Amino acid sequence: MAKIKVAIFTGNYNHIRDGVSLTLNRLVAFLLKNNVEVLIFAPTIDDPALEHMGTLIAVPSKKLPGRPEYRISTGFPEKQRRILEEFNPDIVHIATPDILGYKALKWAQKAEKPIVSSFHTHFSSYLKYYNIGFLEPILWKYLRWFYNHCEQVYVPSQSMADILKEHYIETDLKIWARGIDTELFHPSKRDESWRMKMGLRESDIVITYVSRLVWEKNPDLFADVVKRLQTKFKQVKALIVGDGPALSGLKEIFPEAVYTGFLKGEELAASYANSDIFFFPSDTETFGNVTLEAMASGLPCVVADATGSKSLVEHHKNGFLIPVERKDEFYNSLKTLIMDTDLRENMGASSLEKSKQYTWSAINSRLLEFYKEVLSK
């Protein structure tokens, strides 16, 4: 097969460091290494959060209302359209069904180019946090129309695929999971001096939350449950890793926690390895990158029984899956792990073993094969 040319359209490629931007940059790096030409179209800012991979073409955008750190495209002007036409992609990959994604879909239809899409954000689960849940039927109607015009849709987990099927998205759904660097994230990164630096003793039982700090990911639920545990177990400490708009509010309701701010690389790996339990009650994930990082670091995981983490955590094997509304069950599961050192270690070992199934090379190789499958039709 001749060299493949892929045009990728996304709402975030480098202006915010999150699971979407990191996943897409890893994909582009893999594609370039495997002799695939790639052109990316996305909103940009003057001071991006990460150094992007590949050739990025900026599109007009404005701040997203209510979430000004994110940007939303406002269109696909003639200048960018000419660049796309000159590139003449073999396949159009749309990562966000926003205005830019809609324009890309319409262009690809007119140009008779195959269209694929990847599902990164569980949009409908966010509506309740903004008190606009009444818009959910309209949103699903649009998503159904959008994805049913794609030849393939790549979802990060089977649980997410099941949800799309429930909403009558009938296109070819493929599992494109997320990978992990098992050399970076590993129990061997545990170091008592790191704990000391954070004001934590080796005898402490550290319960950790890692995420971009936004209320949609339920950091307040984490705070409520761990504060309750601390009234019973004096050795329990809370470690909160990340930054975001909810940080100041979280510090107000949970000043006792240790806050590291944003971490990456070896420091992020150390934060997991120096923890004892990972507690992540977010129910808005499509995959659960942080859960996988915790697993690779050998931690038992107490997570919300929702899309994303439920594809990674086996209840009573490497952690506990709890319906997000059952706060007492989160408390009791964490209490069990605090009191039972052997269970904590056994579940952590199971997490470590399961994480070995997820390597970026194998996962992105699978996506490249999906591209080739579409192009062979």
Show where each model-derived region lies.
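Donor nucleotide-sugar binding/catalytic pocket of nucleotide-sugar-dependent glycosyltransferases
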Residues: 42, 58-60, 140-190
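Conserved acidic donor-binding segment of nucleotide-sugar-dependent glycosyltransferases
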Residues: 315-316, 320-327, 336-342
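N-terminal subdomain of nucleotide-sugar transferases
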Residues: 1-58, 360-362, 368
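Aromatic "clamp/platform" in nucleotide-sugar-dependent glycosyltransferases that forms part
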Residues: 264, 283
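Short alpha-helical donor nucleotide-sugar binding micro-motif in glycosyltransferases
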Residues: 84, 262-263, 270-275
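A short, well-ordered alpha-helix in the C-terminal region of glycosyltransferases
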Residues: 329, 336, 343-357, 369
